[in-house]
Amino acid sequence: MKKFLMVLIVTPGLLLTAARAQDKKGAAAPPPATDTAKKKPAGITDKVKSCRKVDGLFTLYQDTANGSVQLYVKKSQLGKEYIYQSFSISGPNQLYLNQSMHRATLVFKIEKAFDKLEFSRVNTRFWYDKNNAVSKTASVDKPEAVFLVEKTVGEDADGYLISADGLFISEKLDPVKPLFPPGIPPTAIFNLGMLNTAKSRYANVRSFPNNSDIIVDLAYDNPAPYNSGTSDITDARYVRVRMQHSLIAMPENDFRSRRDDPRVGYFSQFINDQTSISTVPYKDIIHRWHLKKKDPNAALSEPVEPIVYWVENTTPLEYRQIIVDAGLKWNEAFEKAGFKNAVQMKIMPDDADWDPADIRYNVIRWVSSASPTYGAIGPSFVNPKTGQIIGADITIEWFSGSATPIFDELFKGFSATGNLQYPGMDPQHEANCSLANELKGQLLTGMTVLDASGASAMEVKEMHKQFLVYLIMHEMGHTLGLNHNMKASQMLSPAEINNTEITHKIGLIGSVMDYPAINIALDKSKQGDYYTTMAGPYDMWAIEYGYTPFSEGEEADGLKKIISRSTDPKLTFGNDGDDMRAPGKAMDPRVNVNELTSDAIGYAEDRFKIVNQVMSKLVQKYTKEGQSYAELRTRYGVLLGQRFGMVSAVSRYIGGIYVDRSFPEQKSATKPFTPVDLATQKRAMDVLTKYVFAPNAFEADAQVYAYLQPQRRGFTQNGTGDDYRITDNLLQVQASGALSHLLHGATLQRITNSRLYGNQYSVASMMSDLQKGIFNADIATNVNVYRQYLQTYFVRQLVAMVNPQSQQFDDVSKASALYTMKKIKTQLATAVSTNEETKAHRANLQFIIENALENK
């Protein structure tokens, strides 16, 4: 107690003394420096002393002993936005991880949070008018996407050092491994195993003033794979994928975004105006290069920076000049936009000291993959905030670009791999990959027809040259920002398509961005061009829209004037979203692949005749001394593929709707939706009946069947035999090409709905015509094998439609299916069956129908 009192007594004295001392000196003594002064950064020298320094946009340090990489982030780089772009350099073809695949494109930023650096993705899908008060909520309800947090391992006066392995030896930026779809057996699809970071490594680290490239080999392990993949997979348990991460400075220039328009086809960035009251609050912007005139006042001027493409030294020597000439053909289109020599083509020297994978170079390369998933591809990558194209590459597969036939079966059915989901790939890049063998199939069709007709080697060479020019121009069009125009093949009539006085002026089709059928004349003496070899009217118009320079005040009116010409039939447009290549997809039959002319039905009829003519010459032409029958089998598959393409084109006119996307002020002669007229729908059905459903539709093929033998290779024969699956493949032409679309729920409902605004072909009438085409011709005779499969398939489809549990069909369709089944039952009851096979077949049909009716 005494001690306590002493403290109470002494303490005031001490305080009083301290106060007097402060008054005397006029200021308090500074506190000890060790208590409050900020510690100086320890620096990064010790952390990077065993590393190779790579200077550039971002400074990287790679440990020379273990290969690990550290990233130095300057304080001035915090909060800034950068572009990330990933590329696959080498990997499984069937997973779209092969060379030069452009994958993830995004904007990211780096911010400091205490002792860590946060990497987050920036949402570029919204726009706010800054003059609107609601713009203050721009960041509300848009969750941050922080994909990496790393603790700083060093700091100096200018920046922070972190480990970069978690950023690059990972799937943080690009989820490389595709997602396995539910419901698909794991044995059906090859996929990667789990990422093994211990076995992954850096292949190259380079950095430049405006971009840093980090190339990594990511190792995936799967100790017990269900599917061993295709021949390019050395060992399905262990797969390495080479990827390139590119960190790119946000361009700082006077580039001005250009708005998208639904009447012309550019790749675009979707942006919603969150302060708009419009019913379509879109501020979508197109992808285009930054072209500026050297002389802004000149009607035609060279650009300050042209678009330069390098033909890589992997390109076969005999094709290099053709590619250069093809690329330069785009300059005619750019002249419509006021630019001279906008595109430049150069050939990469064999001793070049630069890497074609460097994003500063736009490269056209050739590769020869083991199992190519595409014929050629021309992706580009952009600034997502503005749409400015930053770089591009074109890759051509030897399989597609060469004039050499590949001895494999080109006519193949459904592949489960197509159902994989690719979260790391931009959807627009993925769309570029969806067409695989069509181009090669068309070229081989032309070569087969020329061979069978005894054409000279020069004629075949000219066909391939035209094909290659078209192919290069098509892929280059993608790199200029253009997406597909699957409606351009409708430009010329059958009477015009082989008139070179017309085609050498405006092209064979309206745009090189279509995937048309190769042009082959039924009468060889009238043959014109096989492929279009110039920018078409649509291409020139599209480039004019995308690249014509305008001042900010003049742009809206200038673009309106250009786009107002969209009603010109030569400028018609429809992209992949509009095309009808798949059963039940879309609605305008003029937007399709593998067809040609404004009368696609008539052109298809001629192609059926050509195929039947060539069938009679296949065995003689491709029975060659010293080789097996593998080539004959391939050629037959190519011709069967032609039939499939034509069936898919003709069948779409039944229940089709012509679409006109013009705006009201254009005063188009047609309505937005116009049902295909009854006569055209009936004509399409007649062509299908004659060339696809009739008992003699495949009569010409019979002489080929006994020769369709593949070449044996080790013990790889089909376990159930090498014979060609004739009935399966022909039924696929009939069913997948026609019936799957005609009996699709979406098609049937559209037929009924369009009755309310002009369609005169009802579901009941259409099914009645199908029933007649599939049953009437042989109702009083024996039924051949083709027809047995066809009739059984048709009846089973009707049974599936009337099933009460089915939710795919509307009531009108169900009623028509039931009525058609009962008509078939009545037909069968009085049919004449003169052999046991036909009796058995018809008894089976009656059993299927009766069983279905009893269970309803």
Spans of features found by a protein language model:
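Bacterial Sec-dependent N-terminal signal peptides
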Residues: 1-24
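Auxiliary tRNA-acceptor-end handling modules of aminoacyl-tRNA synthetases
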Residues: 24-315, 333, 337, 348-459, ...
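The catalytic-center signature of Zn2+-dependent metalloproteases
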Residues: 39-40, 347-367, 466-522
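Soluble non-cytosolic domains of exported or imported proteins
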Residues: 64, 101, 280, 313, ...
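Amphipathic alpha-helical segments that form well-ordered structural scaffolds
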Residues: 322-333, 471-475, 642, 646
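Sec-exported extracytoplasmic/periplasmic mature domains
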Residues: 328-339, 477-478, 482, 518, ...
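Conserved structured catalytic cores and adjacent interaction surfaces
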Residues: 343
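Conserved catalytic/binding loops enriched for acidic/polar residues
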Residues: 458-459, 463, 489-856
